[in-house]
Swiss-Prot record:
GO terms for molecular function: RNA polymerase II transcription regulatory region sequence-specific DNA binding. The lineage of its organism: Eukaryota, Viridiplantae, Streptophyta, Embryophyta, Bryophyta. Residues 860-980 are annotated as: Domain B. Regulator of biological processes that recruits a histone deacetylase to control gene transcription. May play a role in the entry into mitosis, negatively regulating the cell proliferation. Formation of stable complexes with geminiviridae replication-associated proteins may create a cellular environment which favors viral DNA replication. Residues 513-522 have a biased composition (Low complexity). Belongs to the retinoblastoma protein (RB) family. The gene is RBR. PANTHER family: RE32990P-RELATED (PTHR13742:SF17), RETINOBLASTOMA-ASSOCIATED PROTEIN RB -RELATED (PTHR13742). Residues 540-735 are annotated as: Domain A. Residues 1-13 have a biased composition (Basic and acidic residues). It is found in: Nucleus. GO terms for biological process: cell differentiation; negative regulation of G1/S transition of mitotic cell cycle; regulation of transcription by RNA polymerase II. This is Retinoblastoma-related protein. Residues 1-27, 42-74, 513-542, 791-812 are annotated as: Disordered. Keywords: Cell cycle, Nucleus, Repressor, Transcription, Transcription regulation.
Amino acid sequence: MERAGPVLREVKVRSHRQSSLMSESVKQADIEDSQVFCKQEPVEDNIESGYETPTKSSRAGLGDKTPNGGDIKPRKKAWSPVYLEGLEGRFREHCEVGLCLDDPTLQQALRLFKESKPLLLANIDSIGTSTVEDTERLWGGCVLYVVKALSCGATVDGDKSESNAVGFTLSQLMRQTKIRHARELDMISICAITECLLELPHFLVKVGPIVKQMYGDEWEKRLQVKEVQANFVHLTALFTYFKRVYQDFFLSPDTFTNIVSRSLSGVRDEHHVSVHMQFGWMLFLALRMHVIQQFSDLVTCTNALMAVMFCEPLSGAWSKSNLGFCFFVFMQVILILHMPPDLRKFSLQDPVRFAKRSSEGVDLVASLCATYYAADEDVSSLLEKANATISKLFGKPMKGGLAYLEGLMDKKSLAANLRMLEKDYEDSYQSRGGLDERMFINGEDGLLGTLSNESPRFSGSKVLFLVPSLHVDECKVKSSFPLTNVPVYQRKFDIMASPVRFGAFSMGAAPSSPAASPWSSPVKHMGTQGSSGGKRPPSTPVTITMTTAKWLRTVITPLAAEPSVELQLFFRSCDRDISADVKNRAHVLLDLIFSAERGGGWQGVAGLMDVWPEQRKLEAIKLYYKVLGAMCRSEEQRLHTHNLTSLLSNERFHRCMIACSAELVLATHKTVTMGFPAVLEPAGITAFDLSKVIEYFVRHEETLPRELKRHLNTIEERILESMAWEKGSSMYNSLIVARPSLANEINRLCLLADPMPALENLATQVRPATVMHRIPGLSKSGHSGEVACAAHTPTSASSPPQNGSSTSEAGFLSPVKDRPSAFSAFSSPMRNRLRAPLQSAFASPQRPSPLGGGETCADTVINVFFQKALVLAAVRIRTVCERIGQPQHLIERVYKVFQHALHHETSLFFNRHIDQLVLCTIYGVCKKPSYSVSGFRSYRHSCDMAMRMTLWINFQKTGGLESGDIIKFYNDVFVHVTKKFLVQVDTNSSMRSPRKAHGSDGNDGTISKLLKDEMEVIIIKGEAPGSPVASIFSTFPDISPKKVSALHNVFVSPLRSSKVDKLMSPRTRTLYACVGESTRDYQSPSKDLTAINNRLNKRFIAHGDLAGWTLKTDPQ
């Protein structure tokens, strides 16, 4: 009788559901897929479906035109009263029938859904991209996900939940939340799991206060949304690479049969996998769970995306790169040993694929380790444990080392062994929940999509960096209003990476399919990966991260964990010996940083828990000493002194260097929970502090792989666009000195950063729980309310600088341009200008600048920061305006207004995102002369960036903060502040007729100057309002061959990826060294250009090793 209650309840609910279905049977024929965009025709309410449908049968899609040639405006989703009344009933039915929730969990879900329903109705147009039914399911799925994650043993309103686990898994929830995407014209099918995971951060921004009231302050840490997103993306890349490697090594016994059957039937089955591939994937999952069972409840990616995926999305994240590589290599060894000979594509006698040999024959482990950049000793250490696990799973003895288990994959026992693996995984999965990794091998990867073009909501950088540089091969997002959320360098240099010719990778992008793999001939290519400087195929997500891991293992790991003799000499040459202070600071801060990782999700871990953080700490400290030594040598040459007390005695400088080193190590190992900005709080610094050392770090570490340089680029972009403008940024401490007129506004909003905590106090102030990712858009103090704080007054101040920036600060410009930072090493006339001392970036804001001219160090720092912000804004303004079809002269006006706002209305940027001001500026300039800006009509439906535009808008000039729509911000704040200058820009004839790009008209005056190639430095000079302005945006230079003058050096612009793709096939690209790609491992491309220039100019004999050739020229 105990079980009768739930059964009767389910029967009753099902009976009610059947009656509901009968009453709704008539409406099914009338329900049509909704079009987000439709013609402005008379409409009638469809009561059952809940949204308006045109009376005519014709439908208009995105980009269609009205009969008079105008753009079609987006329709708003409308809820009929009848449909609105049934929201809660349908949600209850879904919970009771579809998921069979118990009563406590059901009540929590109903409460969250009911209290958040007003938010659903208020934001209906920005949720999802399809019908109101899909929007309802999507919102309900997010509600259930939160309840699933937070109700297990949680305290709700003071009452302890009796249930230890919610009775459904994450994959079951995603399957129940079926999203039907109605944009058939675009042939896009959005899967539920992708749509739900992408909507979840925006959902949490809206319902965060409600969730906090129900589950307490720690709800964000327990949800770990970024970890779940990254886990799903990495699982997709993991299986894709596994499938490609499998097909490269082995045949499928039923491949021909299936091809013929599919051809005859006309059915397209792109997700067919053989039973042997299924066995290999399941064996991989089983070995992951059992061999490294201590970490079975943690999720993250590994360094090569081929490492172990710890699949519990709610309990933290961790990565173990070397162990993961070795684990995959070991799995490959097992498949090679046990795969039937008639299914093998390879021969053990192949000297290219199996290059490592001994006196006894082929060294299989060493050959695969060379291919996958794994360490032989690590693989050997795993053999014993893995063999014991396989023996236990199948009940057969298996000796240590390379051993053959009879009957493991033969035809008679394969099916039975596969069922054993399935049962083992099912038992584990039901106990931990999470994503079901079997969905890929079972053919459900087609349902989930490949994350490339499946959803207009998807953006690689969102899951990147979701895992930001996850930034991040670029997926071409289909969006009604494509903004520049993807870092600018990725759009142009997606095929370049160092040291091998690997392209940029966004974890959000779909890996290339096996059919399109350039490794179609494994005999030619497989063995070349292990050699240095060889011709390699284009990159994949795995090969990029493996290259980065190899750099860390081969370049950094062999270094000593102590300062070099030369660096110690610099320490002793200071006013006092600071060697002990430097060592102690490094150990304390790195302990704090990596203890935060350990505290984030290593509870209950034994044995291996201390190995990983200690290894990462050693790598970080070695990298720190290496780069610090290079900086000291550079400063010594510049200052002609060995005494660098002002720099080496600066506490903030050392903390930034240590944090940057730790960030690069964590980025190499792809630790999701410790993604940026997690390193800042343990180090006691702000994001603005870290931005001061990024360019110097890249400049002085010549071996830094391209992918890590891009990672630093992405970090700097994030700092420039939003993080430096947030409350508590140290940028305001310099700004209040450089711009005293802003002191009142800065103090009113309490924007100043707190003093940097002392080293001895950091250990007690930093709590691991606070290091976890926070959902963007939420603050500890909430969205609104008066904020009270004491006014901060600087001890001294200088007069504000003139409009613009000092041209002598070019040296501070970092690689935040439409190109990767590897090109920053190129020599150019602009880089020969005076460079500001490094010490001024970390000196006291009130201290006079070493550059003189009456400036303070605060002036220097702010001028450099504004230069970088203008460069970033210029790229985004041009990108947006070109995509919405605006003319060149209007783009220059937009930039002029933005420049004016930054220098003269700086308070507009406080606590806001720079893209908010970019959008408002573009709209304001286009609105005055009545230019068409139809792209903004659908900004609500682009979701990714547009959603962020609606957050953190300060509407009240007095009082607290308020979040709202960007249109309200534009009308209530932006227009009132910039109206006078907007009118001036439109009426001023000199501004309305911009000069030529290079100032050929001969007009005098200070202008903003941009070199022809975007890889050059951009110097933004100050200019008075109303002065003539040069063309800010130059076109791409002609890349056709030209005669080279022997009087000048050669400066080469990068070949755009689109032209590379047209001119060269993947195989042909391996025969050339493209511009920006070094011919030697971890070597700057500038060294190759030096050898080329020396040869062309014949100035002296150059013995430069260029791709194995020695250039020898006679002196002129």
